[in-house]
Amino acid sequence: MSDNVVSRFFELGAKEDIDGSWECFAEDGVWITSDGPEPGKTLRGQEIRDLIVQMNELEHQIRAQGMEGVFEKPVFLSNGNQAVVEWSLRAADGTIVQRGIDLFTLRDDKIVVKDVFRKA
């Protein structure tokens, strides 16, 4: 298992470990989606776990269509309390369908904020 919480979050997600992924978040952690009324939508607590479940189900649908979600290794910013992960959704031929970044804010080896930015 990786030594940083961001990598652990993605590793556990790839294993479909819902609770393990959820436990990467601080008790007061938030996940801000790229779409919604705020702009985006801020999720907390059980809402984060529910979204992880939905994301795993979506991953199965994406793979059934011959597409793949690709997540790059996290890049930590100079203060070490923030990290950026580039990601893309690719068609079977490798064409990028969507791309974006997740901006993480960290505290005490937990995710405090996961803020998603997406280009479609």
What would you call each of these model-derived segments?
Residues 18-20, 26-74, 78:
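A solvent-exposed, acidic/Ser-Thr-rich amphipathic alpha-helical stretch
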Residues 85-92:
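Short beta-strand segments that buttress and anchor functional surface loops
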